[in-house]
Amino acid sequence: MSRDSQPVTITGIGSVSPYGPLAGLMANAPLEPTTISAWATAGQRRAFLVPPFRPAAVVPGLKTRRLDRLSAWALVASSLAFKDAGIDLAQLDRSRVAVVFATAFGCIELTEAFYLSAAANGWHGTDPITFPETLASAPASHVAMFHGLRGPNVTVSNKYFAGESAILQAACIVRQGQADLAIVLAGEALARTLYEWYEQAHLLSPACYDANSQEAAGFIPSEGVAALVLESSTRMQERPEARNYARIISGRWAAGGHAAEIIRKMLSGSGPRLAICSSNGEPCAVSSTSSLVREVAGDDCVIAPPQAFARGLAGTGALFHFMLALSKRAGSPHGSELALMLGTTRDNGFAALLLELP
């Protein structure tokens, strides 16, 4: 996605997270993991969990009885994002509204239940109604059906950069005229099998087991769904009252290669003053992200490190990294500036977005 195309603007934010269901930015407040009680554990196990709530109390008329929590959260987060953007879908051509969803594990709770039922009862003993909900694209389908959206519908998955990939995909869809606006969602729900897999892979922080332990290597698993509304420049001209959280200027994603060289070309001489670290699973300070920021943006670029909650969302934390960085930025005086949102992997892979913040 190059700088030659018209920018796409982020005009609405919604989320379901350990902070609860929210429209707009989350509070810039400390967040502590809670003890898992949804399943039996051998000793204390902690994670950043979404507190129980009734989706219909947030979005009147919403029915979620047969849905996985991930799909229910996607419906709530998308509704809150549209509300925050001030968009009345009844006034739009809904065939021009795209849905892009990012997930690493999909509807893991119903998938877990389906396969455990098959293991216990055989394939003939499984519930056929449950099977469609095991598809990773189920949340995006539910969002489209609930809101009556008939534009492009895409689900992406990536080990490291699913969230960034979703933003890039949605921005390209809007820029290429395939849609006038897009709702971008990313997130995960925690289940016993996923948490235990993290343990077996030795990926977890000591803080998962001891509240007094300092977080070091590893991460604390998280759950939640974030949603962003992206609008075209044409629509923004028709909506002067629309909120502007950020303009997406350009972006790149690569599985390898010379990251610094590619990002410099993307920046085209621009000097971002803020870097939003979107590294997942490890602290920004000990990842390659900080050194790459210094290489392409210099020592004067302020690095906004990710919060532990966003790092625990596998590859889908990018939207929360962005939202939490904006929340922190809102508490201090500032002017318009360029920001580089950057995530890296150990094998030279990276995802980068150049943003203009108001």
Predicted segments, located by residue:
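Conserved "HGTGT" condensation-loop signature of ketosynthase/thiolase-family condensing enzymes
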Residues: M1-P152, E164, C172-Q176, G187, ...
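Short, well-structured beta-strand segments enriched in hydrophobic/aromatic residues
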Residues: L181-L185
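Short catalytic-loop micro-motif centered on adjacent basic/acidic residues
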Residues: N153-S157
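Internal active-site segments that recognize and position negatively charged phosphoryl groups
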Residues: Q169
